[in-house]
């Protein structure tokens, strides 16, 4: 490249740089004016932050440098090309849809903005979703805004891909067979999980790492979808214990349940994840986690050939087993420990493990000795759950008695505005 070409290229870069500065300065001035009109109290409190003069570096350039000096608050997950929605967290109570719309309107066409609010109080849950016209626009915002300072505040944007866009939902037509994948390392992304399976199973349709809507971080489990049932069955045995990143994966079943008239969903995935929701509280098996005297575990999906003694041996490693009961023909069992801590450890570590020839599902049960045993194994997990997260028809349910601020009540994100909030989201 000769000197003339280099000078021309430098001039073009300078022009682009100046245009970018002008665009972001115009956006900042617009946001300041809008903020002063909509939120006079907040504008007064942050008057100095709003007074960006021409002699200062524009908003975008200034905070791009700050972003390089500090770690991004959220590890950005990968997403499919049809996902046009981003998650935003750490919102203040005064921030509403209009404020968020003004933050992003200059960067791309905003289709909709929704802040998730508590169903009872109406207060913001401090996170929401922004949908753009295209995937490219959403990706541009995610890459350029994440970690930069929010207008008229002293806090950075916390952004990530919305975990469950409409494009990631299971198609109504065609076969779809999924597995639950637990014990994932915190750095595992959708792409990493998919690549771990793709080389062995040609029918692989997709992979999803479930992300906490409040923190934007992985919950340590996900789902992998196949187009071929035999490959799904092979993966259940072949991939159990295989490493993805720094940890061995724990594979379990993830069988969809068609919703009833009340939109009840299967909570098999939450049972596979140890019966624990995102804040660590156990979900309802047949007894509330609040009952500290309960030491009985319900074992679902039990191989019909497993004996009482074999079941006992599987749980002995976690503590003293008081009793074991396998009701005839029910495909389930009950294991009672002498203390609750042993039962908790068993639920956490043995959920999804293979006992006999099948992966078991564990949750809190009722003691058969007290005649509180469920007579139908399905009733242990077929209840409806609020605050669900869904992936391709396979669900992770948060128990209804949880603090609504501790889990993602609206993470099953829909394309239209009536698909947000604390309501259960239908999955095709």
Curated annotation (Swiss-Prot):
UniProt keyword annotations, A-Z: mRNA processing, Nucleus, Repeat, RNA-binding, Stress response
Entry-linked SMART domains: RRM (SM00360)
Signal sequence coordinates: none
Domain of life: Eukaryota
Subcellular location: Nucleus; Cytoplasmic granule
GO CC, one annotated term: cytosol
Expression by tissue: Constitutively expressed in leaves, roots, and stems.
Keyword Repeat: yes
Any Pfam family: RRM_1
InterPro entries: Nucleotide-bd_a/b_plait_sf, RBD_domain_sf, RBM42_RBP45_47-like, RRM_dom
GO biological process, alphabetically ordered: cellular response to heat; mRNA processing
Domain RRM: 84-164, 177-256, 295-367
GO molecular function annotations of the record: mRNA binding; poly(A) binding
Family according to the record: Belongs to the polyadenylate-binding RBP47 family.
Described purpose of this protein according to its UniProt entry: Heterogeneous nuclear ribonucleoprotein (hnRNP)-protein binding the poly(A) tail of mRNA and probably involved in some steps of pre-mRNA maturation.
Quaternary state and interactors: Interacts with the poly(A) tail of mRNA in nucleus.
Name of this protein: Polyadenylate-binding protein RBP47
Organism field: Nicotiana plumbaginifolia
Gene: RBP47
């Amino acid at each position: 490249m000769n000197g003339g070409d280099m000078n021309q290229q430098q001039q073009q870069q300078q022009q682009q740089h100046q245009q970018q500065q002008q665009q972001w300065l115009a956006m900042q001035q617009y946001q300041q004016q809008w903020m002063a009109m909509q939120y006079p109290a907040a504008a007064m409190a942050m008057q100095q932050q709003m007074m960006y003069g021409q002699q200062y570096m524009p908003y975008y350039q200034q905070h791009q440098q700050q972003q390089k000096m500090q770690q991004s608050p959220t590890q950005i997950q990968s997403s499919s090309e049809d996902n046009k929605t981003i998650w935003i967290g750490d919102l203040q109570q005064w921030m509403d849809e209009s404020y968020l719309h003004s933050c992003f309107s200059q960067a791309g066409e905003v289709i909709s903005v929704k802040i998730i609010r508590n169903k009872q109080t109406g207060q913001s849950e401090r996170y929401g979703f922004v949908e753009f016209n295209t995937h490219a626009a959403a990706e541009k915002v995610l890459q350029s805004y994440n970690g930069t300072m929010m207008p008229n505040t002293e806090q950075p944007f916390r952004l990530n891909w919305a975990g469950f866009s409409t494009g990631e939902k299971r198609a109504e037509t065609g076969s779809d067979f999924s597995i639950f994948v637990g014990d994932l390392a915190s750095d595992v992304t959708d792409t990493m999980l998919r690549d771990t399976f793709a080389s062995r199973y040609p029918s692989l349709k997709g992979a999803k790492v479930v992300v906490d809507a409040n923190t934007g971080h992985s919950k340590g489990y996900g789902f992998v979808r196949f187009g071929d049932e035999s490959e799904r069955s092979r993966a259940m045995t072949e991939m159990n214990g295989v490493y993805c990143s720094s940890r061995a994966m724990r594979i379990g079943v993830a069988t969809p349940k068609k919703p009833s008239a009340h939109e009840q969903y299967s909570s098999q995935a939450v049972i596979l994840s140890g019966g624990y929701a995102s804040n660590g509280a156990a979900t309802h098996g047949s007894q509330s986690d609040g009952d500290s005297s309960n030491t009985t575990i319900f074992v679902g999906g039990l191989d019909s050939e497993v004996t009482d003694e074999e079941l006992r041996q599987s749980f002995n490693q976690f503590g003293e087993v008081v009793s074991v009961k396998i009701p005839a023909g029910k495909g389930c069992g009950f294991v009672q420990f002498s203390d609750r801590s042993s039962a908790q450890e068993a639920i956490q570590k043995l959920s999804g493990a293979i006992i006999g020839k099948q992966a078991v599902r564990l949750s809190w049960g009722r003691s058969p000795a007290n005649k509180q045993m469920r007579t139908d194994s399905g009733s242990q997990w077929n209840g409806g759950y609020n605050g669900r997260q869904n992936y391709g028809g396979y669900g992770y349910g948060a128990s209804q008695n949880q603090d609504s601020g501790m889990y993602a009540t609206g993470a099953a994100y829909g394309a239209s505005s009536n698909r947000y909030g604390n309501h259960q989201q239908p999955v095709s």
